[in-house]
Amino acid sequence: MTNETKAVIFDFDMTLADSSYAIHHCSNLLARKFGLKEISREVVLAGIGLPIEDCWRLYWGDFKDEWLSYYRNEFRGVEQTGIRLFPNTVAVLEKLRGAGIKTGVVSNRRFASRVVESMNLTPYMDVIVGLEDVTNAKPDPEALFKAVGKLGVGAGEAVYVGDTDIDMQTAVAAVVRGVGMTTGNFDEEGLAAAGAWRVCSDLIEVPGLFGLK
């Protein structure tokens, strides 16, 4: 019920927004620039949720600071303009906040606040924690601990919503209920196996988990 849940914290990529096409496009622009193999959207989906260094090692077996610098300078803006919110993202955030539930983002993106701002979601967020704010990436619970602490709620009063096994493992490690979303690369079975408390196929289902209609 709503009085048992005081905060709902979200992953960003493939949870609040579909970034897969934008990342796919920009990753292949980078590949062409540096003579790397082009990758499929399926490969991109497999990497979403990882820090960018690990994503690129998955894509190309390597990571170079030169690539990252070029990507940030030339393609990060292009990527952000290609990201699209899922259809019910804003409505769900409004419903949760209207019921007095705090909302936030915890992401393995560096400077997650920038992409949240670019999607005009900042007014809906009480806290945003990106990779630059912590020492350890998810599934280490550090970022989720930080968000819960900033929100001033207990772990048992918080929920973390995400689309990957990493997100669910993070929730388990933080002793927070994890809601898995099948909008990314994982199905219901995979998310449940990773520790999901509940699994949803659309964000519109999330408020109902807390008694909101």
Question: Where are the model-predicted features located?
Answer:
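Glycine-rich phosphate-binding loop signature in dinucleotide/nucleotide-binding domains
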Residues: T2-N3, R97-I101, L151-E157, F210-K213
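Conserved H-loop
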Residues: K37, T122-D126, G154, W197-C200
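A short, structured active-site edge motif that brings together acidic residues
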Residues: E42-V43, T122-A137
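Surface-exposed amphipathic alpha-helices with a cationic face
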Residues: V90-G98, V148, M168-A173
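Acidic, Mg2+-coordinating phosphoryl-transfer loop and its flanking beta/alpha structural elements
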Residues: V159-R198
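Substrate-recognition element of Asp-dependent hydrolases with the DxDx(T/V) motif
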Residues: T89-E117
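N-terminal helical cap/lid subdomain that shapes the substrate entry/recognition surface
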Residues: T2-A91, K95-A99
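Conserved Lys-Pro-Asp/Glu-containing loop-to-beta segment of HAD-superfamily phosphomonoesterases
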Residues: T5-A7, P139-M168
